[in-house]
């Protein structure tokens, strides 16, 4: 799941560079919303080390929370730093009409306040997005120190890239994008890493 599309692109580049192919269509697809959340979570958990991590009770949020805690201890990263990332990411997503979440954190905050008013509940009055993200009623802890807005959703998506040999690129476009390098690496399971950061 996590890297199959990028590996497909790299394999396409290698295939073209070797002369084996002139044209490669590389893509990736992820369809995760047809299963109930608990089943999807179980499937995702198989990406972790089944002997040491999954059976010890780790979930993916728990693994990332462990790394976040280590980063906080080693570099002084704060929850506010993570909140700033969430705000920035939602701001960028709001600029993309195809984004899963086309709302800024401020949009979400205002919608929550409007919903509370509509339901006759006390209307929260957050000063800004940071104060909203500090509110555990709207941004609960998923796996400390990570909160709801720090996590990625279960989602569907797909993308593809048409790769062509340089000598025929102009047959497809007047402004080709050139790939000047590629690389690939793989990490160890969390318990085998020398550093969690």
Where do the PLM segments sit?
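Short acidic, glycine/serine/threonine-rich loops at helix termini
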Residues: 35-40, 94-98, 190-192
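Conserved catalytic cysteine-centered active-site region
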Residues: 1-24, 31-63, 106, 121-151, ...
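Condensing-enzyme catalytic core mediating Claisen C-C bond formation in acyl metabolism
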Residues: 50, 54, 73-74, 83-87, ...
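Active-site-proximal alpha-helical scaffold in enzymes
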Residues: 1-30, 62-102, 161-168
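Polyampholytic, low-complexity intrinsically disordered segments
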Residues: 84-87, 92-164
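Glutamate identity and glutamate-enriched acidic tracts
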Residues: 30, 39, 53, 74, ...
């Amino acid at each position: 799941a996590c890297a199959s599309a990028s590996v497909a692109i790299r394999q396409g580049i290698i295939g073209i560079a070797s002369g084996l192919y002139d044209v490669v269509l590389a893509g990736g697809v992820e369809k995760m919303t047809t299963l109930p959340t608990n089943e999807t979570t179980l499937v995702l958990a198989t990406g972790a080390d089944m002997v040491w991590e999954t059976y010890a009770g780790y979930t993916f949020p728990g693994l990332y929370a462990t790394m976040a805690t280590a980063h906080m201890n080693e570099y002084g990263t704060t929850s506010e730093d993570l909140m700033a990332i969430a705000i920035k990411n939602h701001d960028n997503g709001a600029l993309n009409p195809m984004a899963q979440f086309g709302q800024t954190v401020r949009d979400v905050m205002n919608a929550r306040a409007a919903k509370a008013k509509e339901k006759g509940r006390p209307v929260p009055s957050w000063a800004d997005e940071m104060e909203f993200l500090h509110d555990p009623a709207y941004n609960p802890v998923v796996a400390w120190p990570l909160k709801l807005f720090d996590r990625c959703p279960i989602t569907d998506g797909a993308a593809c890239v048409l790769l062509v040999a340089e000598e025929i690129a102009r047959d497809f476009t007047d402004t080709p994008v050139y790939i000047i390098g590629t690389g690939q690496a793989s990490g160890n399971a969390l318990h085998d890493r020398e550093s969690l950061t």
